[in-house]
Amino acid sequence: MSKSLKKLVEESREKNQPEVDMSDRGISSMLDVNGLFSLAHITQLVLSHNKLTTVPPNVAELKNLEVLNFFNNQIEELPTQISSLQKLKHLNLGMNRLNTLPRGFGSSRLLEVLELTYNNLNEHSLPGNFFYLTTLRALYLSDNDFEILPPDIGKLTKLQILSLRDNDLISLPKEIGELTQLKELHIQGNRLTVLPPELGNLDLTGQKQVFKAENNPWVTPIADQFQLGVSHVFEYIRSETYKYLYGRHMQANPEPPKKNNDKSKKISRKPLAAKNK
């Protein structure tokens, strides 16, 4: 362990410092950082831009953590013990290699921000209790492999930001209309052709709201409304005409558009040896 890392641990312990930043230190294992798991007092741990491939179960010993940042590592799996961090409010796992989330992951009672952008996750990756995370205010799932967004998304009623950009989504569930506190919705770069009329329940057209939906193969009537502006889209999907057309469209069960995103070249898919060169 480098002297600087050792010094960080010692200073945090001696001065009772609540925040520890170990970003960009070439760390390949948390177990190599002697004394790290004895810092039970810390509330923030930043390990972004390292070379971690796993998170050891010992992470549960950092029981006062409120912010945990693993952005831009090579993490392929998480221990079930991560859900025992009951004070956690902000968890950043963006830009890793996760294919699945551990069972019990949804039992974090205070989690407000969950960053999972740029992994290898899909609708089958989520544990059964994932949508018990009812305290979530921001959920980032962009740059993953979701084709379907589970209907249970409607349980996350405190969501203000939902980012689903650059997945393989072929539809959105009607339950998305239950997210009445939503201020930002990012669905650009998917395979969406229609929007559920229930989306019209949401107010996403104001100056402080964000609705991004470009680069989708919309059916012509929706594409025409996008030419006029977002407010026209929402006005249209609230109309009886659209509700009728949407019903007909869903009954016909059309073939979904082909995938247009080649994700085989994603960094998160490359063998680790190739990535480290």
Swiss-Prot record:
Keyword Signal: no
Keywords recorded for this protein, A-Z: Acetylation, Leucine-rich repeat, Repeat
Ranges annotated as spanning the membrane: none
Domain of life of the source: Eukaryota
Pfam families hit by this protein: LRR_14, LRR_8
Ranges for the LRR repeats: 41-63, 64-85, 87-108, 110-133, 135-156, 158-179, 181-202
Annotated positions of the N-acetylserine modification: S2
InterPro entries: Leu-rich_rpt, Leu-rich_rpt_typical-subtyp, LRR_dom_sf, LRR_domain-containing, LRR_R13L4/SHOC2-like
Acetylation found in the keyword field: yes
Residue spans of biased composition, Basic and acidic residues class: 7-23, 256-265
BP GO annotations: neural precursor cell proliferation; positive regulation of neural precursor cell proliferation; Ras protein signal transduction
Coiled coil, from the record: none
Region (Disordered): 1-23, 250-277
Function: Potentially plays a role in the Ras signal transduction pathway. Capable of suppressing v-Ras transformation in vitro.
Protein name: Ras suppressor protein 1
Gene that this polypeptide is encoded by: Rsu1
